[in-house]
Amino acid sequence: MTTPILNSSVPGNIQKKSLEGTHIAISGLIGAGKTTLAVALGKVLNLPTYFEEVIDNLYLQDFYKDPKKYGFQLQIYLLNSRFQQQQQIIWQARGGVQDRTIYEDSVFAKMLNESGLLDDRDYNTYCKLFQNLSNFMRRPDLIIHLDVSPEKSLERIKLRNRDCEKDVSLEYLQNLYNAYHEFLQDISRYIPVIRINWSEFVDPEQLAQMIKAEYESMRFMNQINPPTFGNGPTTNKIISTPKDL
């Protein structure tokens, strides 16, 4: 089964290169650092920020304890929550930096289905609902994907020590990592994607400036290797690798 991510009837403004009013989505594994970068980008680009609901999520902790029992309920809850946030971004017409979008929810749902944690009946119901909602959605102008390994993701999850995430397993993160790889290959045909090696945190505001410069010249999928920030000069540079489509 394919991930239902490409049916948005209202396209993003891919040709626009000014970041004023741009809708930027930040994707990545749990604990990748999406919120940290969202705050920095919002500040540097003077865009409103929209964050993922975690603490007030009514299903998340139950899901991590028993994903097979609560998988469908969680996915419907998240789909509704992110659709509401997506509509807010559209109608306020100011753009914004969004910490995880509605499109990524379909990545989680597909992964749960393939892992046997979401049966075909529930997954098909989810996909049909997603496709119906997609008629009222607008694609982001840019996706920034924070690339971290499942091991690094789990390490950061343990460091931030949220009760609702204490049952996240490495196997779950590995399956999610694989699902993201397929998602990025698909979505980059429609929305520009910047992949960032985020294995080690760097200065988020300086990285935001790099992203701004890269977006002005990019096409399809690009990659940024952030410099190592320290006392000495930096020698790394932005590496652009457009996809061969």
Curated annotation (Swiss-Prot):
Binding positions for ATP per the UniProt entry: 28-36
Active site: 99 (proton acceptor)
Keyword terms: ATP-binding, Kinase, Nucleotide-binding, Transferase
Catalytic activity: 2'-deoxyadenosine + ATP = dAMP + ADP + H(+)
A Gene Ontology molecular function term of the record: deoxynucleoside kinase activity
GO BP terms: nucleobase-containing compound metabolic process
GO CC annotation, single: cytoplasm
InterPro entries (UniProt xref): Deoxyribonucleoside_kinase, DNK_dom, P-loop_NTPase
Annotated residues for binding of substrate: 52, 64, 75, 100, 105, 165
Family: Belongs to the DCK/DGK family.
Miscellaneous comment in the UniProt entry for this protein: Can also efficiently phosphorylate medically important adenosine analogs, such as 9-beta-d-arabinofuranosyl-2-fluoroadenine (fludarabine).
Function: Specific kinase that phosphorylates deoxyadenosine but not any other deoxyribonucleoside, as part of the deoxyribonucleotide salvage pathway.
Protein name: Deoxyadenosine kinase
Organism: Dictyostelium discoideum
